[in-house]
Structure formats: C-alpha cells, structure tokens
Amino acid sequence: AASKYINVVPEIEMPGHALAALAAYPELSCDSTQTYKVSPTWGVFEQVFCPSETTFKFFEGVMDEVIELFPSEYIHIGGDECPKTAWKNSAFCQQLIRQLGLKDDTTPSKIDGIKHSKEDKLQSYFVTRMEKYLNSKGKNIIGWDEILEGGLAPNATVMSWRGVEGGMNAAKAGHNAIMTPNPYVYLDYYQEEPEIAPTTIGGYNTLKKTYSYNPVPDDADELAKKHIIGIQGNIWREYMQTSER
C-alpha cells in the first residue's frame, strides 16, 4: 500500500457493534452472566462494551497490536450505533456516571443543538479514554459522527455518515471532519431502479447524484472550510456475496 501512496486506516469498533467480541470475552460486557452469541445477520444490537477498566485494558492491548501492524497516523475507533440500554440498566455504569458527575443536558449542546443524556456523555468518556491512550502512542482517532453526542474528544476527527450536519458541526467547532454522507456517497445503495438491480441494503444513489456532491458547501465559513479535510465513499458488504458484486 505504501508503495502506491495508500494509507490504510484500521477501524476497531467500540463501544457498540460488540456482539462477536462479547461472545468470546463476556467479561467485557455489563452483564458477564449473560450468554452472548455471534449474530448470523447484520444489525444494531443492545449488547455493547462496558466502560470498565477491564474493557479499557483489553482495548489498550488490542491497540498496541494494531499500532504494530499499521503505520497510519490515524486509527478509527467507530463510535456509531451504540444503544445505551445496557448502560442504563447497569449498576456499574450508573455508579460510574455519578462518580464522573455526568448529568442529562437541560439545554441543547452548543455543537449540535441537541440535549444529550448522561449515557451519551458516558460514551464521550469512553472515546476520550481511548483517545488519550492512542495520543500517547503518537496516533490520532477518527470516529463516526455519533461521537459528537455527549461532547467531542479534544483531538478527534469526525467522519460524517448520517448526512452532512455532523461533519459541519464538528468543522465549525474547530475539529477536522471527513464527509461521507449516506445520501450521496454510500456506494452500496441502489444505483438504478430496484426492480432491475441486484438486492442491496436500500437507498438510491445514482452516479449523477454521487458526483454532484460538494463536500465543502458554498456557504461554509472559513473555519469550517479549513477543517473539512476529505471525503470518503463507503461500501458495506451485507449484500455483496461475491467478488464480482
């Protein structure tokens, strides 16, 4: 990859999309007495990593191995699609929330204009813990735009997939952003009429629509323009069973 000037950025998903890991390491969950099984289908599941010292020690070890394998300045830590049900029902998590002094917002966030829960802020704590560790190793993190919820880690780059708002909010606040909004650059969406195309996850992005996307809006202020550092097209393989697809 390096010989072709390609920088491979690894992604280690946390704290959601954890089911496969919890099946192997149930002690990383909020309820280690529960039986976890790898799902045979894609989806968003309520079983997530617990923000415990055991979990952080596990991820620090994982990151040490990742750093040895990938010279990239950046490591993507996910952060998307993390239901908070397990944390709301966990005595450990609720005690940690009180210990950290986290509270539900009473006024909208200055970054995204939304009131966030104390569990959202616990995810920010999780992300910030991992950011500090990776920063100490000379690495910077990238996370999906959900990492904005509850407060953004100081040096994080936001990858905006749920539209353009997350990336723009991050850029306006002085954080780097990579624009990858699903209404434009999800390349696994239908590109022609669904009746005549192979089955995909959904959506409808024509080639014309994708090429028409401008990652830096004309009305963006100078600070935002400075911090929009790139664009990414995404392909997810739930419905791609062959290399030809």
Model-flagged regions — what are they?
Residues A1-K137:
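Substrate-binding cleft of carbohydrate-active enzyme catalytic domains
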Residues N140-A156, W161-R245:
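Flexible, acidic glycine-rich loops studded with aromatic residues
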